[in-house]
Amino acid sequence: MKIASINVNGIREAVELGFLDWLAEQDADVVCVQNLKAKSFELDDTILYPEGYEGYFLDAEQDGFSGVGLYCRKIPKAIMYGLGFEQCDNEGRFLQADYDRFSVATFLMPSGDDDPAAKQTFMTQYLEYLNKMARKRREYIICGTWHIAHKTLDLANWADNQTTP
């Protein structure tokens, strides 16, 4: 199975810049998409259901903000929208497709730029979910935008990010 992941930073602009061509070129079974910045009900069918894919989306309540999506060639057995805690679900940050023996999820971590405490709370709640996942007899593939840098090399301006979680 081939899985791809991309942060589009706005699905409409990404489509204008060639996202649908990129999607076709990937020939992936599942494509995880983050930062849609659009309500799915406002999108054209060419974006919702590109040729050969079924699209699934979790919108943020706030217009023009976050949102995640999955493009799947094979229809999943189940789709899980959100994680059951307000910040994640209202901001459209987690979407999971369940297949027979594994699950594929797309994930968008808050950046923490405006509210580091909210990001820390989110990470604590997300860790609880990851611990639950670890106890299940299932394989997970989580793709996404984590907004976490492992090393200073991973940051464009590491000195300015020393106080951001």
Identify the residue ranges that each predicted region occupies.
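Structured beta-strand-rich core segments of catalytic domains in phosphoester-bond hydrolases
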Residues: 37, 44-110
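Short catalytic/ligand-binding loop motif for oxyanion handling, primarily in non-cytosolic enzymes
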Residues: 12, 40-42, 64-65, 112-114, ...
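Soluble or luminal CAZymes and related metallo-dependent hydrolases
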Residues: 11-15, 89, 118-126
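Active-site-proximal beta-strand elements of phosphoester/diester hydrolases
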Residues: 1-9, 101-113, 143
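Metal-dependent phosphoesterases centered on the DNase I-like endonuclease/exonuclease/phosphatase
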Residues: 51-54, 125-165
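Surface-exposed cleft-lining segments at the edges of enzyme active sites
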Residues: 84-85, 108-124, 159-164
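N-terminal, active-site-proximal structural segment of metallo-dependent hydrolase catalytic domains
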Residues: 1-49, 54, 60-66, 81
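Short amphipathic alpha-helices and their capping/turn segments at secondary-structure boundaries
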Residues: 20-24, 93-100, 125-138
